[in-house]
Structures are given as structure tokens and as C-alpha cells.
Amino acid sequence: MKTRISARAVRRIRRIRPRPLPLLAFTGATVLALCGAVLVPARGGGAPPPRTVSAWLPYWAQEGAYQDALAHADQLRTVSPFWYETKSATRVDGHPGAGERRIIDGLHAAGIQVVPTVMEQMKPGVLAALLTSPDRRAEHITALLDLVGSRAYDGIDLDYESIASTGDATYRAVGAGYTALVRDLCSRLHALGKVCFATVNPKTATTGRVWEYGSLGQVADRVRIMAYNLHYATGTPGPLSSTAWYDEILRRATAEIPVEKIEMGLPAYGWDWAEGSDEGARHLTSKGAEVLREAVDAPYGLDPASQTPHFTYQEGGTVRTVWYQDARGTEAHLPVLSRYGVHNTVLWALDFEDPGLWSVLARGA
């Protein structure tokens, strides 16, 4: 079914879209104090259920995401603020709001680990050159340790995605360099009582070959698999994930990584594509997708093949298609995790999600 959207509704939807902000410089040339791991306070009333959910906290929606984390603290074991970006071997910049002590302290008080994410958006070949140079890797580890020591962080999460498309001639060397970086960084962090996470792309028959899952699973405390963007903003419309895709991802991952170290990434967002347009899809949070669906009076539909929701509508003379994930779709995906013995998840991202997701996650994978 296709429905029309009014200009007023368009304005309403666009107001809820996240808008990334410019970076602020972070300099960590010296370490003032390397803090030990923060202890999670004991809770009374008997042993609580295990916390199996982690989540990323987006800097461009920081306050809402922080309040969302506090509201679901009993389910969250780790929050990773999406705060930092690697620019070179020796330079790591902070996004707006990076390192806000109020948030770090508040999460710790709620018994949640704070493990910031360091991402990168380097041009092709730049990160590969860093990873394949032992000297530059050593410089980069020093910069990352400086960052960890700048606040009461519990460790670090590396989200280095630009190497995913490394070509045939160099992907083995680049993958080995990334593994060496993670191995040496984790060793240094463990000596300080800190944790070390690696965020990676899914490994399938056609993707993810640069990631040495087996070696990463030996040295990292957790390996986070970004199990979303099966269809992406600049591609053709379709589901962000599917149960069959999850099966392929986990069949390969659990053959190489201890299941207790795997965190399966869950999407809490969607894409809104314009039919016949080369323009990339609009990003929507899961909550925003539902607001849009109701605004255009589109019926709710769960795709039986992928077990993800979708709808179409018209904006002006253009047909638009939205695919996203919600609590109902996630509930259909979790049995795949259970079949492989994977019980830990990581959500992209806080305050994006369908509010009903938390009760689904509470029942566990």
C-alpha cells in the first residue's frame, strides 16, 4: 500500500533526523593518570539476572541516549559512547561532548561499564599503511592509551571499518596488521586492568575476509559483529538484516570466536529510499520510522522472508520505501542467536530503539 505524506508531516519527520556535528580536537600527548578498572557495585535483593546487553551512545543525540541508558541500567553491562575518531597514528580527535565526566560518572553509578568507541573514516589505504607498519602501530597504541588514561574509562572499543574493502593483493597483510594492533593494545590494556573490544563487519561468503576472527577472538575481550546494513543507504531498498543472514554470520563466527566473547550487533534504525533516485537513503531511527509510518497512515507489515518491518508511501510524486527494525523483528531474530549459544548483544544505538525492544531483550537470546 502506498500513502501520501503532507508537507507538514515531512517537516515533522525531518526534525527528528540526527545531524552529525563537527569534530573537536582531543590531545592526549601525556597520561596524567591511568585509572584501574571501575568495580560494578553489588546490588541487594539476591543475584540479579545477568546483563547481556551493550549499546553505543551517539554523540549527536547524547543526552537522550544517556537518559535511555540510565532507564535500562539493569539490562546494560556496557555503554560505548561514540566519542572519538582516529585521524592518524598519533592523533585521535573527540566529537562534541566527548569525555563528559557527568555521563561517565552517571553510568558508573548505575553499574555500567564505560568503554568509549574510537572510529575512523580514513581514505582508502591510509589505515592500511598504519596497520602494516610496526612503528606506526606502536605510536597509535600510545595515543590510544593516552585517551583511555584521560578519563575513568574501563577500556576501549576499536571500530576501524575502512579496511573492510581491502583488495586481493593486500587484505591478508592488512588483516594481520589489524590483529597485531588489537593484540598489542589488548595486552597493554589488560596490564592496566582494562578491557579491549574489537568491532568488526560480518564474515560471510562474500564479505569480511580482512578480519582474522580466530586470532581476534583469542586476544580481545569481546568481538562485536555489526550485523546490520544488509541493505544500505547507497544501495537498493531491502531489509537491514534477515534471519538467514544471521544464521550465516553466526555459523562462521562461532566456528572461530568463543561464543561468550561474541556481541551480536542489533539495528535500531532504518533507511528511507526514494524510488528511481541516485540519492542515498535517509536515515531514520526505529522510533522515527514508526512516527513516519503513522504520519503517512501506512499499514504495519513484517516481511516474512527477513522478519523485518517495512512500508511504502508517497512524498510529492515520489514513491519512497522504508525498511527498519523494531521489537517484533528483533524477537524473530533472537532464536538464531540462541541456536548458536550467543547470548550477548550490542545495540546501535541508544535512544534510537522501539521502546518495546527492552522487554524482548530481557527475555534473552
Please report, for each region that a protein language model flagged, where it lies by residue.
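Conserved, mostly hydrophobic/aromatic
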Residues: V79, L158, V223, M264, ...
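Substrate-binding surface in catalytic domains of secreted glycosidases
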Residues: A89-A98, T142, A164-V296
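Glycan-binding loop/region signatures in secreted carbohydrate-active enzymes
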Residues: L266-H333, A365
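Acidic/aromatic/glycine-rich contiguous surface patches that form carbohydrate-binding/processing clefts
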Residues: H333-A365
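A cross-domain feature marking catalytic cores of carbohydrate-active enzymes
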Residues: L57-Y59, W83, P116-E120, Y160-S162, ...
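Glycan-recognition patch characteristic of GH18 chitinases/ENGases
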Residues: G45-L144
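Secretory targeting and sorting signals
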Residues: I16-G46
